[in-house]
Amino acid sequence: PIYYVGWEEWVSLPELNLPALLAKTDTGAETSALHAFNIQTFGKNNEMVRFGINPIDTDERFSVFCSSKILDQRNVTSSNGISEMRYVIETEMTIGNVRKKIPITLTNRENMKYKMIIGRSALEGFQISAEKSFFTEYPQL
């Protein structure tokens, strides 16, 4: 089946207890990126990472704290040309009726409208509309 997504969509990251995030599709990015602050490694050999996120783009006072196993560390060059080392985690993403495990880099996106961008690796199997947003419904909480 072909699944359609718009240039912006509601997604959920259930393994991180994030039921609804406004995200922008970005075919210029290979890997998805998630806004994170207070990023800290922990555990034996620092194999885990914990971080905070403000999932509501209009309310920075509301924070959710998450943790995940570190999949990788990558040097990522953002659209403004600045390179930074980022932790990569793997977690389940839900868009509409589609659930899939995707890699996500953690970075500070506090000045960005979208707390998450959905990169090409997560968009495999989707048709993207550059003209429409919200093909999928708001996630069921």
Q: Where do the protein language model's features map onto the residues?
A:
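Pepsin/retropepsin-fold aspartyl endopeptidases
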Residues: 1-141
